[in-house]
Amino acid sequence: MEEFQGYLELDKSRQHDFLYPLIFQEYIYALAHDHGLNRSILLENVGYDNKSSSLIVKRLITRMYQQNHLIISVNDSNQNPFLGHNKNLYSQMISEGFAVIVEIPFSLRSVSSLEGKEIVQSHNLRSIHSIFPFLEDKFLHLNYVSDILIPHPIHLEILVQTLRYWVKDASSLHLLRFFFYEYYNWNSLITPKKSISIFSKRNQRLFLFLYNSHVCEYESIFLFFRNQSSYLRSTSSGALLERIYFYGKIKHLVEVFVNDFQAILWLFKDPFMHYVRYQGKSILASKGTPLLMNKWKYYLVNFWQCHFYVWSQPGRIYINQLSNHSFDFLGYLSSVGLNPSVVRSQMLENSFIIDNAIKKFDIIVPIIPLIGSLAKAKFCNVLGHPISKPARADSSDSDIIDRFVRICRNLSHYHSGSSKKKSLYRIKYILRLSCARTLARKHKSTVRAFLKRLGSGLLEEFLTEEEQVLSLIFPKASSTSRRLYRGRIWYFDIISINDLANYE
């Protein structure tokens, strides 16, 4: 935030919400590509930083000054005089700068709203792994869970209308429409499935901003019981996920509820309702009855459609009983099961056998989807049999091993919280043998002969750092070592889902 305040005349911007002139300032583009704004962890530039320079930025600004309007036809975009020969580069640079500009009002409001409030500031709570200790603590006492697929707007103009509440500069909103129509397949912008449009791939920062502003709109309904929620929020998509920014919207929602929904306000008084979200999926769990969960389901659908104009269907919300259902979230399969235990109690001459069943939150790695992800990445076939990677056969041996080891360690690091490690051992086996097949193919040898020549060195490379430390401290055969290998570990440095663990 200090970087923004150092460069911008914030008092003027705050009074008039007039942001459009900032698009002509060179330092905006410097901020857009500055890796010191705590953004480098979340977003990586998409390969044009080597082409961007102060000279290109100045040339771009000169062209914008000379052009009287920003009108573009999708059919005639290749000959647009505003963009010229460097259409893709210039358009991408403008969109990156524009993303910085429209974030300013939200950043200012976040700073002012956080002042004087006691909110957990630990960076550890940014980790998406912090969600699982929260689930372990809360879900053992709940009965039902709803898997919610996030609804999408009927038309992208709704995204522009959403921003009008915060950005009151008409020129900036027109520029946003310009970017929507600049790219083909723009209707797939919000689609979280396989092929996100060219727009979202080449304009990641702007895409995440729009997506989160859209999600926070309909998510603001849950602010009514935010006092019962945990501060373990995922901030992997940026600071916009902090719902504290939307106090203005709450005021409006209170009026709506009081006037139109007085009869159903009791729904919000459930102290055992908990909500978590990541990307396009959210989980809503409660200790209530099936009737209460179904009322929530149809109420949310109608509320989103009538007041936020987002298309949703009851079929996108799945209600299940926690005791006999496993829900897929963040690459893990989670469930609440009963762990039976038998206790023998003896009092004088009489003895009793007491059966106890303790609830246990079980988290495992779904092996079939993970093998499917590895098969898509050409590490194995659909049955899980390792295959070689011919695309990497031209690299050096050390480079090939490093790449496989990095993938293996990242997966082990991400899935370290699994209750059962057998799935991880199988994944390690697939990656290790795929690496050996790739190297053997490169050297025109058999896998057996290559592994015999390489010895145990390849196996040691695939050990994670924590396994290497434990192997030095404890003997492999000791019970302490085995318990630590099997133990569940959550790492608070993970702020985004692993690509191979993202099965959507």
UniProtKB/Swiss-Prot annotation:
Disulfide bonds: none annotated. InterPro entries: Domain_X, Maturase_MatK, Maturase_MatK_N. GO terms for biological process: mRNA processing; RNA splicing; tRNA processing. Its main location: plastid. It comes from the Eukaryota. Signal peptide: none annotated. Pfam families: Intron_maturas2, MatK_N. The keyword Hydrolase does not apply. It is found in: Plastid, Chloroplast. The keyword Glycosyltransferase does not apply. Keywords: Chloroplast, mRNA processing, Plastid, RNA-binding, tRNA processing. One of its GO terms (molecular function) is RNA binding. One of its GO terms (cellular component) is chloroplast. Usually encoded in the trnK tRNA gene intron. Probably assists in splicing its own and other chloroplast group II introns. Belongs to the intron maturase 2 family. MatK subfamily. This is Maturase K. The gene is matK.
